[in-house]
């Protein structure tokens, strides 16, 4: 899933440089959603790891 987040990020950057507003906003939106999903998964796994150590 991280692979797809990076792909959409690169597509958003390229579209932003070329000035394609519709493509850029859609790709950036998907990349932003994936970023927050990974952030939540990271925090949950971090908390689970800390709880298991105790």
Curated annotation (Swiss-Prot):
The chain crosses the membrane at residues 3-23, 30-50. One of its GO terms (cellular component) is plasma membrane. It holds the Pfam family DUF1328. InterPro entries: DUF1328 (IPR009760). It is found in: Cell membrane. Keywords: Cell membrane, Membrane, Transmembrane, Transmembrane helix. The keyword Transmembrane applies. It is a multi-pass membrane protein. HAMAP family: UPF0391 (MF_01361). Belongs to the UPF0391 family. This is UPF0391 membrane protein RC1_1636.
